[in-house]
């Protein structure tokens, strides 16, 4: 495998990593606790979700010794989530919602924690719109994201107080330092970023204890 230059159409020597490559890298990371895998399939092809999960499990079963970290399988629709079952305790599931860039009227409708509560999941994730612009709407997408996230955080805390069960909320994808600081202050449990070293430095400077 390799990439082709879009202009010259010449194939490069860069190797496209496979899932096996990812797993081989992951098992070498001594401090790794979670590996988040996003499974994507159209709703009308949701039957592919459990098929992909089984392929993942088959690959993981070949690893010796077994990995010490857990897998979080993230799915963007409830229909796909309903099909996911695993007897392995190291596989966890998460409803994954990316907010639309505009058109949000009912903020509660876009929260993720209620879905996690319904499926008894330990994780939920909420994504910032990839293509967002304040000109598309009267509302700033970042302000909308924070509002929905704040609702989720309140639901998470209320759920914990009522049941002692905790739902970890993951925010994605953020590379802006100010936004990352804001997310940490709000109380998210994890942040997906393309700049992990920067994220770690920010968290340490803010007094967070990292494993």
Regions found by a protein language model. Name each.
Residues 1-92, 142-144:
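Metal-dependent phosphodiesterase/phospholipase catalytic core, i.e.
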Residues 94-211:
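C-terminal active-site rim and adjoining tail of enzyme catalytic domains
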